[in-house]
């Protein structure tokens, strides 16, 4: 099960008790103090791991504790430090104070390790308290307590391409067709109730991550339906693929404008992402009807049909595609018709999207 929001109570370890001990040796009836210090309590760290994709490993764990420090021993033997607690999280995890709502960490980079809570300091053993007036102190310090914080972890998926469309538009089918993701697919609205990630292999050494974002409806940015809960997952997606259902009762242009409006209402920044448009379920229409609807949609967007067909698009269906090297980000990179079921233009879509992904990665690395 995908979990994107979890609350935990986290404890760092308590410091170990300092020891009260006296040196015991043959012929030394009253040896001096030699109680060792207690060990420090374990710290709490967050570690970002790109191979972790969800927060589901925290399911059912309400309280997590680092180990307490061990008490000191005689002969000035220092107590063992408590074992640290390392919380492994996927990239895109945000850590909030559950009570104040304050953002504590925004964890994005793979391998990033941050100290969250320091363990309590171990108490000093009695040898520290020997003085001219007190040669045999019977006092040692207790260890300092650890820290306790209630936190909320929130995961925002980080993907190269986010699929955006109304419920049942075919996003789950597409992602299962061109990636290694195997979502459950059924023919009803809100099939996808949680975001899913798929790794799309372009070649042996080249791939990109696609996020199947749950279908949104008009008013999602205002919290209607399940929309607002899931829109946050595309905030960090680098590019967007709008998916328009050509077999739907909804007019294609109306679908597109509604989706754009929802994204803009949710985040102006998100609405400015590089984007492309896939016209889905084209196999459900007669070829002449499909051509007519595609041509009208392209004209309604004030675009000119055609472009460099370097990706091997099927010529029987009209399309619009830009040159990636002269890309105008105010327009879609492409408008192409697809069918995941009949595999129409699926490979072409994959290669075209990868060009867009490479461009976005290159620009991000040069910033």
Curated annotation (Swiss-Prot):
One of its GO terms (cellular component) is cytoplasm. The gene is obg. Keywords: Cytoplasm, GTP-binding, Hydrolase, Magnesium, Metal-binding, Nucleotide-binding. Disulfide bonds: none annotated. Belongs to the TRAFAC class OBG-HflX-like GTPase superfamily. OBG GTPase family. Residues 159-358 form the OBG-type G domain. This is GTPase Obg. Residues 1-158 form the Obg domain. An essential GTPase which binds GTP, GDP and possibly (p)ppGpp with moderate affinity, with high nucleotide exchange rates and a fairly low GTP hydrolysis rate. Plays a role in control of the cell cycle, stress response, ribosome biogenesis and in those bacteria that undergo differentiation, in morphogenesis control.
